[in-house]
Amino acid sequence: MLTRIVLFAITNLAVLILASIVMSLLGVNPTQMSGLLVMALILGFGGSLISLLMSKAIAKHTTGAYVIEQPRNPSQRWLLDTVRRQAEIVGIGMPEVAIYEGPEINAFATGADRNNALVAVSTGLLQNMSQDEAEAVLGHEIAHVANGDMVTMALLQGVLNTFVIVLARVVGGFIDSLLSGNRGSGRGVAYYGIVLVLELLFGLFATIITMWFSRRREFRADEGGAYLAGRNKMIAALERLGINHGQSTLPTQVQAFGIYGGIGEGLRKLFLSHPPLSERIAALRMARE
């Protein structure tokens, strides 16, 4: 967590400097509300939308996943056939299907377009899950694609980013004015230091909101997996994950869209993208009754 906070601080400092340069070149005054909103919208949505558009390429690069063009064995043929069948049921285009090296049981889906997505599974999943369990996991990922979760998460992140940028600067300006005793003075080093601290603080709250929404999204994807593969298969798949549990080794760029997001206790649970497996299994069983 400390490493992430340090990296977040460095990134925000770089963004502050870059934003000031860009706004100066464009003739936009970021200290005025209109200029602040322009800057916040550009920075807030720019990063999340670029990440969304590049999500497939980023996922392939960070995981080393290779796309199955022509199946080399029955397992790969089964993967393609299952994904194709499930995609047809929910009415989306056939996603690219990929495999990445990893001992953990996991899979993920990503892509900016529900008709041009990517579904990838780990070698650990293929080695440790039955076909019934793997079918449910694939259904879970196809449900993410069909529900448009990648786009929704990007838009939510953009809104929260914009909120953090605006609020940090408004509150930062107020605090700086109180400390300096001069509400009309220009912004100095202290102001940017205050803004950086506030962005860290508000950014943590924004992350909690994003992860809460992500956990709600997982329940819906589980329901989608139950619809596509069968409720018992989806429950069995989650139980298998519980037996072979551990910390997720997926890169952070795609971790939110994996079938499994790791475990956590106490406050750390607020920052998890996935609910506890026990809660997901209980939700599926309650829906069946």
UniProtKB/Swiss-Prot annotation:
EC id: 3.4.24.-
Keyword terms of this UniProt record: Cell inner membrane, Cell membrane, Hydrolase, Membrane, Metal-binding, Metalloprotease, Protease, Stress response, Transmembrane, Transmembrane helix, Zinc
GO cellular component: plasma membrane
Compartment annotation: Cell inner membrane
InterPro entries: HtpX_protease, Pept_M48_protease_HtpX, Peptidase_M48
Cofactor binding, note field: Binds 1 zinc ion per subunit.
GO molecular function, one term: zinc ion binding
Domain of life from the UniProt record: Bacteria
Binding residues for Zn(2+): 140, 144, 218
GO process terms (BP): proteolysis
Top-tier EC class: hydrolase
Membrane-protein topology: Multi-pass membrane protein
Active site (UniProt): 141
Pfam short name (any one): Peptidase_M48
Keyword Cell inner membrane: yes
Membrane-spanning parts: 5-25, 33-53, 155-175, 193-213
Protein name: Protease HtpX
Taxonomy of the source species: Bacteria, Pseudomonadati, Pseudomonadota, Gammaproteobacteria, Lysobacterales
